[in-house]
Swiss-Prot record:
Gene that this sequence comes from: COX10
EC nos: 2.5.1.141
Main location: mitochondrion
BP GO terms, sorted: heme A biosynthetic process; lipid metabolic process
Protein name: Protoheme IX farnesyltransferase, mitochondrial
Purpose: Converts protoheme IX and farnesyl diphosphate to heme O.
UniProt-listed PROSITE patterns: UBIA
Membrane topology, record value: Multi-pass membrane protein
Tree of life domain: Eukaryota
Catalytic EC class: transferase
């Protein structure tokens, strides 16, 4: 029988030494399977798997012992900003400067300040002055009511009611009254003129009341009374009410209900439709043209009490005249309308603005030729009106082709004298009525 290794070693070494060697060999042989299994377990822990490479920052991980020690790839050093200064340890340290106090140092009244203290006082005074200037400018931009003088009130109310525009409205109403068939009634004519003027003042005042925040952004309208604070909004609304109520009452009771209804409808159309529509759509120009075409119709209905073909012809002439007039005006004010937030053809549709102006210049030729057909004027009127209608059509064509400020100004100034001259020619060439010149019937 073969002897085991530990028996051989124990035979060679006798005594205590042999016993110790025998015990160690036996212990080693018994513990070897357990150590082998323990070694396999530790080796499995040290293997690198796919999960070690699945980090978002792609860190290279190496396990040294049982605890995981991660070695991260060093990041590049950031570029030093002009506000940071590198220290000896390699870290960035923010450099903070102490600000000088704005308040001047207190000086005793018993001694005079020296030159150094005066130099320190100067920057603080400059800063305080700049702050005061900023506050003053901010206060200037705020709306505040100015002190109203009694002798300034008529001029302020005249500008609030747009007295020149009101005079134009009254003149077109008077032309419609004079062109209507029938005898000329002076009391009715005066009542119609006064009522129409009051209605126009009311509509213009309410229009300015609604457009205060927008008029302040335009050079053309920034000096209006409400924008400058020369009059309070309450006083402006009260003035508009005091004009609208008696104006509509005079037209309704003093003239006829039809004329009063047209006056009330025109106030509503101008204040509640045209005014808000100016910031919504370019259709405001067509609505505003209808507003301007109603006054001559009111003059016709005041004289006749009915809506005839002549009333619509006068309204059509005023309707077409307003497009070259206003489109040429708005062309030179495109920057102001855009800054004020108004939606105008000259700003959003410049090509359409020029085409519409030319189209209605040519329409004036057709409407003038229709006057004798409707038995309003004689045939001499379209012949006499041909030169001025042809001239404004030519300027409308130049405005359409050139599309510049010079051509728009020429068209605008031509429209200012074109309408009064055209209405004067209509009055001159008015067809006489046979019954008006006839004598009393024989008894």
């Amino acid at each position: 029988m073969a002897a085991s290794p530990h028996t051989l070693s124990s035979r060679l070494l006798t005594g205590c030494v042999g016993g110790c060697v025998w015990y160690l060999e036996r212990r080693t042989i018994q513990d070897s399977p357990h150590k082998f299994l323990h070694l396999l377990r530790n080796v499995n822990k040290q293997w690198i798997t796919f999960q070690h490479f699945n980090f978002l920052k792609r860190m290279y991980v190496t396990q040294l012992n049982r605890s995981h020690n991660q070695q991260v790839r060093p990041k590049p050093e950031p570029v030093a900003s002009p506000f940071l200064e590198k220290t000896s340890s390699g870290q960035a340290k923010a450099e903070i400067y102490e600000m000088r106090p704005l308040s001047p140092p207190s000086l005793s009244l018993s001694r005079k300040p020296n030159e150094k203290e005066l130099i320190e006082l100067e920057p603080a005074s400059v800063i305080e002055d700049s702050i005061d200037v900023g506050k003053e400018r901010k206060e200037e931009k705020r709306w505040k009511e100015m002190k109203l003088q009694v002798y300034d009130l008529p001029g302020i109310l005249a500008r609030l009611s747009k007295i020149k525009l009101t005079a134009l409205v009254v003149s077109t109403t008077a032309a419609g009254f004079a062109l209507a068939p029938g005898p000329f009634d002076w009391p009715c004519f005066l009542l119609t003129s006064v009522g129409t003027g009051l209605a126009s003042c009311a509509a213009n005042s309410i229009n300015q009341f609604f457009e205060v925040p927008f008029d302040s952004n335009m050079n053309r309208t920034k000096n209006r009374p409400l924008v400058r604070g020369q009059i309070s909004p309450l006083l402006a609304v009260s003035f508009a009410t005091c004009c609208a109520v008696p104006g509509v009452a005079i037209l309704t009771l003093g003239v006829n209900p039809l004329t009063g209804a047209l006056g009330l409808f025109n106030i509503f159309l101008y204040t509640c439709c045209y005014t808000p529509l100016k910031r919504i759509s370019i259709a405001n120009t067509w609505v505003g043209a209808v507003v301007g075409a109603i006054p001559p119709v009111m003059g016709w209905t005041a004289a006749t009490g009915s809506l005839d073909a002549g009333a619509f012809l006068l309204g059509g002439i005023l309707y077409s005249w307003q497009f070259p007039h206003f489109n040429a005006l708005s062309w030179g004010l495109r920057e102001g309308y855009s800054r004020g937030g108004y939606c105008m053809m000259s700003v959003t549709h410049p090509g359409l603005c020029r085409r519409v102006a030319l189209r209605h210049c040519l329409a004036l030729l057709v409407l003038s030729a229709a006057a004798p057909v409707l038995d309003i004027t004689t045939w001499t009127f379209p012949i006499m009106a041909l030169p001025i209608n042809a001239y404004i059509s030519y300027l409308g064509f130049r405005f359409y082709v050139d599309a510049d400020r010079r051509s728009s100004r020429r068209l605008f100034f031509c429209s200012l004298w074109h309408l009064p001259l055209l209405l004067l020619l209509m009055l001159t060439c008015k067809r006489p009525r046979g019954g008006g010149d006839a004598g009393p019937p024989p008894s």
